[in-house]
Amino acid sequence: LISGNNTGTGILQNIMDSNGTGIICESEADTVSTAIGTEYGNWSDTLRKAFDHDRLSYNRRTDREYQEVSRSYLSVLLSGTPAQVKPLIPTAENGLFSRQNFYYMPRVTQWADQFGEDEVDVDEEFRLMGNEWKNTLDELTLRGLFTLKLTHAQHKQFNFLFDKLFHRSGKINGDEMSSSVIRLAVNACRMMSIVAILRSLEDPSLVKPDAHISSDNLKDRIIPRWNLVITDDDFHAVLALVEPLYLHATHVLSFLSSSVIKRRSTADKNMLFAEMEDEFIRRLLLEKAHDRRIPESTALT
C-alpha cells in the first residue's frame, strides 16, 4: 500500500521495493498532485508504463544503484473534484488520460438521513472482507496462471460494440478520444477477467486445464495453466459498462486543456448521437434533442 503523499521518485521506489506491485488509494486527489509537485514527469511515466505492466527501472545517483522490475502491477484509486483533475492530468495528449477510468458523481440535491438503525461495525466488516479476499487470492495464486477465453460469438459482439464507439468518437471528438476507446477495450477485458474468476469460485466448470498440459501432469494434478470462460450474462453485464464509462470520460475531458481542437463534444451530445441511426435527417435529431432537453444549438454544433 503506497502513500499518495509521496514524490514521483518515491512512488517508483516503493513499487521497486515490493517487486513491482502496489496500490495507491487516496480520498483527495490533490494529496497526490501537491506531493509530486515538480516531479510530475516521473509520476506520469510510471502510471503510463504500469498500465501495460511494462518494465520499470530506477537509477539512484547518490550511490549509483540501479534497480529494475520486469513487470509492474499498480492500481490507483483517487477521488476528488473536477478542479483536482487538471493538476494530475493537465492534458489528454500525453496518454495518461486515456489510461484511466472515470466516474463523475452527480451532485447531491437533497438531504439524506445521516442516522442508521443498525449497529454494524464498519471497520470490522471491512477487515472480514479483506481477510476473506486475501484467502481467496492466495488460493488462486497457488493454482497458477488463468487465461480468459472468449467465444467466437463474444468476439463478434465485443468488436461490433467497440467498432461503433471508435467510429462515433472520431466523428464527434476527433482523435482525442480514440486512445481512450482503445484502452477502454483493454480495461473491459480486465474487468471480464475479474468477474469470470470470481464466478468460477461459484461454478468450477468455468475453468478448464490448458489444452497443452501433458497427460502425466493432468494425472498428477500438476496444472500450472488454466483456461477461463465468462458466462454470457456476465459478459453482457461488463459490456453494458462501456458506454457509461465512455460518456464519463468525455465529460472529464471537457475540464482539460486542448491544443488540438477548438470545440469539444459534451457527454450529453455523445449520448444523443449514440441513440441516432448512422444516417438521419435534421428534424429527427432535433426531436431527439428536445426529448433529452438538449438545446438546439448544442445538438447542431
Report each predicted region and the residues it spans.
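Phosphate-handling catalytic cores of nucleic-acid transaction enzymes
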Residues: L1-T301
